[in-house]
Amino acid sequence: MAEKPVDSLSESEAEAELKRLAEEIAGHDRRYHAEDAPTITDAEYDALRRRNLAIEERFPGLVREDSPSRRVGAPPAEGFAKVRHAVPMLSLAKAYTDEDVTDFIERGRRFFDRDKDLDIAFTAEPKIDGLSASLRYENGVFVQGATRGDGAVGEDITANLRTIADIPAKLKGSGWPDVIEIRGEVYMTYAEFEALKARSAAAGGQDYVNPRNTAAGSLRQKDASVTASRNLKFFAYAWGFTTADPAPTQYESVQKFADWGFKISPLMVRAKSVEELVAQYHLIEEQRSSLGYDIDGVVYKVDQLELQRRWGFVTGEPRWAVAHKFPAEQAMTTVQKIDIQVGRTGTLAPVARLAPVTVGGVVVENVTLHNEDYIKGFDSNGLPIRDGIDVRIGDTVVIQRAGDVIPQIVSVVIDKRPADAVPYEFPHTCPVCGSPATREINEKTGKEDSRRRCTGELICAAQAVERLRHFVSRGALDIEGLGAENIDTFFNAGLIKTAADIFTLRDRRPAVTKALAERREEQARQREAASGKTRKNVRSVEDRNYEGLDKLFAAIDSRREPELDRFIFALGIRHIGETTAAVLAKTFSTIEELIRVGKETAAAEDPHTVFPSVNGIGDTVIDALCDFFGNERNDDVLDKLLEQVKPKPYIVTVSADSEVAGKTIVFTGTLEKMTRSEAKAMAERLGAKVAGSVSAKTDLLVAGPGAGSKLKLASELGVEVIDEDTWLQRVGKA
C-alpha cells in the first residue's frame, strides 16, 4: 500500500505512523550497528528517517521520546562493558545529488551572511564504509576504545582495538592535548576479506558476506586474538572530547593525527566552492574501484573549527557537515537458474543464481527475486518495475549492491535475451514436501498476498529446519554454539525434528558425536578433492571426540528457563516479532495463560470480539495467534517443548500507593542519572502511565537539558514540569 502523504495525515494517523517508524527504524539500527546484518538499502533507510522527520515537523507535539531523530545507531550489544561518550558520536546529513551539495553550501553562506567578508573553506574526504570507533588518549597513551553504539553509549572494545597496527599505543611526536578522543573508521581491505574467506572455506568454516560486516564482527570478538588475526585497518578523521583543539581547522587537525602516528586518508583536500567539492567527489568516485577497500561517499565539512561551533547542530546531526553518497555500483551478468527456498513460515522465496560477477569489491553469485510478481516485473501494488520486463533463465541482467550491501536486479537487457528463453513458471507446490503452495487472500482488501506459501507446515522439512534455526537465534533463545550449520547437521541426522529435541541432545551424545564427525569428514573429503592432496593418518569417525560438546550442552541447559517474551518470539508464530512478543508477555504474564486465551480465541466464532483489547495487538496478530493455537498439530509440539522448558513468568511490580500512581507522565530532554528505559520502567513500577507525547491528559512532564517542543507545549497546557532531581526526590530515589 502506498504511503499517505504527510500533509494528508490526521493527528491520530501521524501518531500511529511515528510509532511504527520508531519501531521499524530501531530494528534496522539494531541490525546494522549491533548485529552487523542490514536488511534494507541505505536509500530505503534514509527515506524512513526523512518521513519520520517530516511528520515531526508538521506535528511537533507528537515527537516521541524514542524518536529516531533523538538517537544515532543502536544500543550497545550485550557482552561488552558500556562506555558513555563524553561528546556524542553523531550521524551526518545525506546528500545524493550535486544540487544537494549546493544547498548545503548555500545554507552555510546564508547563516554567516552577516559576516560579508568571511572566507568559508571546506574539506572533502572519502566516507569509509566500516565501523566507527572512538579512541581515548590520556597524556599520549591509549587508555580506552569504544564503538559508536547508539551515539551516546558504546561498547568497550579496548582490547580488540589494541590489536590493530594502525592504532598507536602511544602517540608520536608532541603537541597533543592532555586528553583527546580520536575518532575514525575500522575497516577491512578487499584483499584481507578474500584471504579470510579462503581460509574459512578451506577449514569448513562460515561464509562471510562483505568486508564491512566482517570488520564489525571481527571487532566485537570476545577473544582479542581473533580480532588480531583479521588484520583490520584504521583511518582517523575526527575527534570527540579534547582538552584543547588539535589545530584551528579541520584539515590541519587531521594532518596532526598523521604526525601523531595515525593513518589518514590521502584523498582529503581543502576546497572553497561547490565546484571544487563536486570535482573531488567525482575524482574519488573514479578511484573508488582501485582503492582496495569500501567507501560509500565523500564527506564535506566546514574547515574552520570556530565556524563549526557557531553553526552548531540540529536533530542529532552537525549542520556543518554532510555525506555525499555514491550511487550504487552496477555490473552485468547472466541468470543461470532460479531456485526456490522455503522459509520458516512456508514462504516460497525465489533466488536467481548468477554467473559470478564482482560489484564493489564483492563477488555476487545470488540475488533474491522476492516473489512471483517481482519475477514477472511488478511490485506488490501491481505497478511495473524494470519497465514491466520479467526475469528469465538465460537473461542478461544489470545488478547493483543496493547501499553497497544487498544485491538486486535493476534491469534486464532485453536485446541480449536468448531466443529460447521462456517465462519462468512459478511452482504451485512446495519443492521440498510437495504440499500445495497458495497465495492467501486478504479478507479486508480482497487482494492476493504477493507471496506463495507452502501449506505443509510441520510435515515440511524446510519449514521445520527454518523454525529450529529461528528458535535458537539471537533474539529468541540465543543458544551459543547451535548455529545454522549444527542445526542442519542434527536435523539431517534425525536427531532433532522439533525444538523439544534440542534439549535431549545431551542424552544422545554418541549419536551427536557421530553426526558432527561425519559432517567434518565430508567437508575434509571435499577439500581434498578440490586441492588434489591426500590426507594421512585419518582417524575413524568412532575415534573422534569433540570437547566442545560439553560447552554446547551447557549452553542448551542454560536456556531451560527463558524469559517469556523470548520464548514467545522463539515459537516463530507468523507476525509475532520481538516487540509484539514483549507486549503479549506483559499482557498475559505466563505461557499457560497465553495458551488458554489463544485456544479460546481460536475456537470462537468471532475471535476479534473474544481476544482482550491490547494496545499494539491488532487483527493481523490475533488471526496469527488463532492459526497457531487452533492447529492441533502444534499442541503436541508445544506440550513436548514445555516438558523441557519452563518460561519465567513476566512480572511487573506496581506500587499502587505511590505519589505518581495513576498519573500520565512524559519524559523529555536528556536524563543524566538514568537511561530513558530505566526511567520508564521506574514510573510504571510506581503505577504511572508513560506517554510519548504531551497532551491535555498529561499530568507531569520530567524535563532534562535539551527539552524542546514538549516543554513548550506543556507550559501552554498548564502541565506540571519538574527536572530529573525533583522527580527522583518525589519517588524516593534521590
UniProtKB/Swiss-Prot annotation:
The active site is at K127. Its cofactor is Mg(2+); Mn(2+). Coiled coil: none annotated. Zn(2+) binds at C430, C433, C454, C460. The keyword Heme does not apply. The keyword Ligase applies. It comes from the Bacteria. It is an enzyme of class 6 (ligase). One of its GO terms (molecular function) is metal ion binding. GO terms for cellular component: cytosol. NAD(+) binds at D42, A43, E44, Y45, D46, S91, L92, E125, R148, E185, K301, K325. Residues 655-734 form the BRCT domain. Gene3D superfamilies: 5' to 3' exonuclease, C-terminal subdomain, 6.20.10.30, BRCT domain, DNA ligase/mRNA capping enzyme, Helix hairpin bin, Nucleic acid-binding proteins. Keywords: DNA damage, DNA repair, DNA replication, Ligase, Magnesium, Manganese, Metal-binding, NAD, Zinc. Its EC number is 6.5.1.2. SUPFAM superfamilies: BRCT domain (SSF52113), DNA ligase/mRNA capping enzyme, catalytic domain (SSF56091), Nucleic acid-binding proteins (SSF50249), RuvA domain 2-like (SSF47781). Pfam families: BRCT, DNA_ligase_aden, DNA_ligase_OB, HHH_2. It catalyses: NAD(+) + (deoxyribonucleotide)n-3'-hydroxyl + 5'-phospho-(deoxyribonucleotide)m = (deoxyribonucleotide)n+m + AMP + beta-nicotinamide D-nucleotide. GO terms for biological process: DNA repair; DNA replication. Belongs to the NAD-dependent DNA ligase family. LigA subfamily. HAMAP family: DNA_ligase_A. DNA ligase that catalyzes the formation of phosphodiester linkages between 5'-phosphoryl and 3'-hydroxyl groups in double-stranded DNA using NAD as a coenzyme and as the energy source for the reaction. It is essential for DNA replication and repair of damaged DNA. PANTHER family: CHROMOSOME TRANSMISSION FIDELITY FACTOR 18, DNA LIGASE. This is DNA ligase. It comes from Mesorhizobium japonicum (strain LMG 29417 / CECT 9101 / MAFF 303099) (Mesorhizobium loti (strain MAFF 303099)).
